[in-house]
Amino acid sequence: MLPATFKLCAAISYQHLRNVTGLRRQAAVAISQELSKLSCRSTGPSTWISQVRRRSSLLSSRLEEKPFSEMEMSYIKQGEEALQKSLSILGDQEGWKTETVADNGDKVLSKVLPDVGKVFRLEVVVDQPLDAVYSELVDNMEQMGDWNPSVKEVKILQRVGKDTLITHETAAAPPGNIVGPRDFVSVRCSRRRGSTCVLAGMSTTHGAMPEQQGFIRAENGPTCMVLRPLAGSPSQTKLTWLLSIDLKGWLPKTIINQVLSQTQVDFAKHLRQRMARAAGC
């Protein structure tokens, strides 16, 4: 009886692991397929799309190095979904309208999507190499509140593997306090391959951070930042930031659009200042 029971338990456990592994492979296959579509639709970003595809092809084998719980796999899947959706939006060059163009060339564009709403796209060049920008945005993520006036605090709630994080972000009140206190709980994933980095995210839930008194729990995503060296100038970084946020509450769309586009412009300005100080300029 005991050997039979053991075999039954082992079979159930094996089947569970097969199912979890299948989810991992499905995530990698989905991203690879989406990137293939993007490469066919758009010739502009085909180089970095190919680089990310090579990175995602390693996803299944790398994830299998350590078994994850169902909750952890859920976070990984959410991060991959944010990555896939973001790349799909950025890969479609049609329908973008210019919101603002700064004197230094910084540009904010927008687009209305049926299933997402209005999204914003920032395109800037940072006079620092990719490694330095990546380190500031990823490795020093919890220090963002020190230099970004739109952010009060970023806290990492949980790490899942090497590339997935769950974070809590508290937004700083904008001038005039036209938008009340907001906070976010997000799942973030990063993919880096060669000279291309993609940082994607979307809203999620986490037991360690229920809705906080005095804050409206807003939602974001899909969002993503794409970093790659500026063509012909590897000491500079081309940064593209896709922003999609639902601030919740009763706010006129004109105010929301103004706040979000200005948030992107301010981010670029303060990121440059932060990078210049770090480089001793």
Swiss-Prot record:
Record Gene3D superfamilies: 3.30.530.20
Any GO molecular function: cholesterol binding
PROSITE patterns linked to this entry: START (PS50848)
Any one of the GO BP annotations: steroid biosynthetic process
Pathway: Steroid metabolism; cholesterol metabolism
Tissue localization of expression: Expressed principally in steroidogenic tissues as ovary (granulosa from the largest preovulatory follicle and stromal tissues) and adrenals.
Record has GTP-binding as a keyword: no
Keywords attached to this entry: Lipid transport, Lipid-binding, Mitochondrion, Steroidogenesis, Transit peptide, Transport
SUPFAM superfamilies registered for this protein in UniProt: Bet v1-like (SSF55961)
SMART domains associated with the record: START (SM00234)
Catalysed reaction equations from the record: cholesterol(in) = cholesterol(out)
Location of the transit peptide in the chain: 1-63
GO cellular component, one term: mitochondrion
Record's subcellular location: Mitochondrion
Pfam (any one): START
Classification via InterPro entries: StAR, StAR-like, START-like_dom_sf, START_lipid-bd_dom
Domain START: start-end pairs: 67-280
Subunit-level organization: May interact with TSPO.
Function text: Plays a key role in steroid hormone synthesis by enhancing the metabolism of cholesterol into pregnenolone. Mediates the transfer of cholesterol from the outer mitochondrial membrane to the inner mitochondrial membrane where it is cleaved to pregnenolone.
Protein's name in the database: Steroidogenic acute regulatory protein, mitochondrial
Taxonomy of the source species: Eukaryota, Metazoa, Chordata, Craniata, Vertebrata
Gene name as annotated: STAR
